[in-house]
């Protein structure tokens, strides 16, 4: 009976984290569909319409290290509740407001809300609750963000057409709220409820990678800076996702094709996150990083140079989605391997800050490049180079560890 209760708790935590990933990662991945109608409603340029996304990213990044420190003083439940309330407030205001300035202010609230509920919190909870099969479990949880994005993109597109921007945005905010609620009941650590992490008694995971790490954490050291650069290059690739619908429309294809490409990338998001988790458990994080980044590179090549063939474009969208797996599964597990469980929260929160600064800047830069040149080609070419460069840096880091 006791074993059944423990297993039930592990399953509840897993399901709640999957739903949280749907809410705070999956739904925001569909926000690219809102850029065009928002710019039209407020009569502003594409760069101005996406500025609140950049602001939210910066707020998430700067808040994440503070949230990790706050978890030492307040309960995880309190942090979650504050985050969910801020997401609800920002969603309501952005969905009803007529002023771009207020939209940008709400970007700060949304960013803090995401810091309390999104990537950093999800990966910390995953690491605290699951010691065995971390790659597979991390991949499964993060794949649900892709499931939500894949299923929800055409739904959002239909809501925009039938109900308009404001109602569609409010519905999305409400769904985020509902999906995030179960995670409020997850304790920060299983020890807080007199339990042990799943797989804690397995001999095969009592290794240096899982607990101690290979390096001492230094934010100005060569290891962290190289990892930060690698992560930045991956972000250069993943950030294009928000602009896939606009990119397709700029090629004089229908908005439905744009939504379909975004949905296809979310299918790849789901598939490759799950596969990379299994691959990491079997082949290691370095092999998996390089392999899946190259897969994404192939998809991006087709999207960039052969976008006229709709069938090929959709297949390429799926393949391109492998970059999500690298960003959301391989990079966090690399941080854990490098610096160990004890320093993971501190290290990944700072890396997340750097990622969000990069993502925010890149989103705005892409919008600016399009507004000034009328084309997304330069952005896609940069992403192709970044794909190869990130893999080269990861191979370099692997060589350094072996030495």
Regions of interest found by a model, annotated:
Residues 12-37, 42-46, 63-67, 152-153, ...:
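Extracytoplasmic
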Residues 38, 116-130, 326-339:
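Intracellular juxtamembrane helix-capping segments at the cytosolic ends
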Residues 31-35, 219-276:
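Extracytoplasmic gate region of multi-pass secondary transporters
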Residues 62-100:
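Conserved MFS/SLC helix-loop-helix module at the cytosolic interface between two early adjacent transmembrane helices
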Residues 108-143:
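Cytoplasmic helix-loop-helix junction between adjacent transmembrane helices
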Residues 63-75, 273-284, 370-371:
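Helix-to-loop junctions at the C-terminal end of transmembrane segments
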Residues 149, 338-373:
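A late C-terminal transmembrane helix in Major Facilitator Superfamily
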Residues 280-334:
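C-terminal transmembrane helical hairpin of 12-TM major facilitator-type secondary transporters
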